[in-house]
Each structure stands twice: as structure tokens, then as C-alpha cells.
């Protein structure tokens, strides 16, 4: 009896070993099939085939926001970032001079994949690093500048969003008061002045090419400015520049 049992066990050992090999091969194949090669600095896919959606934030730091405005803006942005999928690209810029050189993003990372083939420790570190850098960068909104080159800044940001992305969105956080060599909306006759400088305005016009535009419109306490007129001008200007203006949401407080 003992001898027959040994023969029976020896018969099933190769079968069990073969099943383990098949299962192991399946896990290995799935691992490499789902693995996306990424840039080690940004965490973004190297191959254009793996490029997903791209979201760029353009923050106006020309004047401080109120605490209520700041809280509302950060919450809105955080909700938008939370809705991004793995490997979607997020860039954050502040409005600046972009006539000779492109703006450099303060934040340029892709959202980490919580189900990547990396170790759990590495996945958790990347997720935490992404969130911490995001919080630190949003603090750059609180600043003070004499000028506000919004038009050329939008053009710079748009130039970094090629149509190889499935979806492209720019969120502008600003009071939308242009104050540059193109024109100053602090002037009571700013609209007429911009019309007189139409050739310069066209030369600086951003090429939006179907990019989705969302605006968190945060007027500051600037006496003598008709913000409704400012808002309406921007809606027309961005649409004429090829942008898909989805919404202009007021941020009060």
C-alpha cells in the first residue's frame, strides 16, 4: 500500500509543478503587459502612445487673495486634481513675462498610478510626494507684482499642450485684469485702448486650438474696475483665440 501511494504522489508532482509554472507565467505576462515606462523625474509616460490627459493651472499672483477666496480656490483645484486619472499630467504656472521665453512650470508631474508594478512602499511615497508638492505650489498664489501679463502667459502655457494628449485643459485663477505693455485694464478706457492696439493684440494672441478653458474668476478690491465688462471681454477674446471656454466661475469672499 505504501509503495502504491508513493507512485500516486509522484504522478501528481509534475502536474502540480506545471500548473505553478503556467500561473507564474501568467502573472509575469500581466506585470510586463501593464507596465508603462515613465520619466523618473516627472513620472510621466515616455511614449506618446501612453500620453493621457493634461491639465495646466495658471495662477495670478499679482495681488493677495482673501483667506476665503484662497480656501475656495484650493478646494476647487484639489477636487479637479482628484478627478485626474493615473498618468494624467499636471503643470502649475504663475503669470509672468513670457514674450521672449516660455514660462517654466513650478510643478510638472503626472499623477502616480496606485496600481503600478512598483513596491507598495514606493507607490505610497510617490503619492505622498505628489500631494505635498501640490500643496506647496498652490501657496505661490499669494504674492504681489506690479504687472500682470495674462495674455502672453496663456499663450505660453497653451504652447506646452500638444494635441497628442487625449484631453487638454487650462484652468486660469485670476481677476483677469491685464496690466502689461499690451494694455492696462486699470485705465477707464482700456477697451478702446486695446482696440487701437489691435495689431499688437493679435501678435500676442494665444493659439488655443480647441483647448478647454476654465476660469476661477477672483476679483480683488480694485476701485473703478467693471469686472463684468472684464469678464465678458475675456470670454470673447479666448473664444476668438480658439479656446473652448467651458465656464467662468466667480470666487467671492
What feature does the model see in each segment?
Residues 50-64, 133-140, 214-219:
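Acidic/histidine-rich, surface-exposed loop or edge segments in extracytoplasmic proteins
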Residues 53-57, 87-92, 168-170, 205-219, ...:
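Hydrophobic beta-strand segments of well-ordered beta-sheets in folded domains
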Residues 72-79, 155, 193-201:
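N-terminal post-signal-peptidase region of extra-cytosolic proteins
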Residues 48-166, 169-172:
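Von Willebrand factor
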Residues 177-231:
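VWA/integrin I-like adhesion module and closely mimicked acidic/polar interface patches used
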Residues 221, 225-253:
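Von Willebrand factor A/integrin I-like adhesion domains
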Residues 3-56, 62-69:
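Acidic, polar low-complexity linker/tail segments
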Amino acid at each position: 500500500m505504501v509503495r502504491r501511494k508513493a507512485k500516486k504522489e509522484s504522478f501528481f508532482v509534475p502536474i502540480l509543478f506545471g500548473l505553478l509554472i503556467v500561473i507564474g507565467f501568467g502573472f509575469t505576462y500581466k506585470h510586463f503587459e501593464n507596465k508603462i515606462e515613465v520619466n523618473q523625474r516627472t513620472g510621466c509616460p515616455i511614449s506618446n502612445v501612453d500620453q493621457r490627459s493634461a491639465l495646466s493651472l495658471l495662477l495670478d499672483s499679482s495681488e493677495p487673495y482673501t483667506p476665503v477666496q484662497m480656501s475656495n480656490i484650493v478646494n476647487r483645484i484639489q477636487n479637479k486634481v482628484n478627478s485626474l486619472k493615473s498618468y494624467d499630467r499636471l503643470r502649475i504656472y504663475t503669470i509672468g513675462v513670457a514674450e521672449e521665453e516660455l514660462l517654466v512650470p513650478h510643478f510638472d508631474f503626472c499623477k502616480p498610478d496606485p496600481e503600478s508594478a512598483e513596491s507598495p512602499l514606493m507607490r505610497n511615497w510617490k503619492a505622498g510626494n505628489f500631494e505635498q508638492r501640490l500643496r506647496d505650489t498652490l501657496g505661490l498664489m499669494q504674492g504681489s507684482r506690479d504687472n500682470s501679463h495674462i495674455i502672453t502667459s496663456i499663450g505660453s502655457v497653451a504652447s506646452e499642450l500638444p494635441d497628442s494628449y487625449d484631453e487638454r485643459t487650462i484652468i486660469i485663477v485670476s481677476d483677469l485684469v491685464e496690466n502689461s505693455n499690451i494694455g492696462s485694464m486699470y485705465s477707464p478706457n482700456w477697451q478702446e485702448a486695446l482696440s487701437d492696439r489691435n495689431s499688437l493684440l493679435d501678435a500676442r494672441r494665444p493659439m488655443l486650438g480647441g483647448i478647454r478653458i476654465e476660469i476661477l474668476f477672483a476679483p480683488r478690491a480694485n476701485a473703478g474696475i467693471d469686472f463684468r465688462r472684464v469678464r465678458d471681454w475675456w470670454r470673447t477674446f479666448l473664444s476668438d483665440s480658439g479656446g473652448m471656454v467651458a465656464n467662468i466661475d466667480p470666487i467671492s469672499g
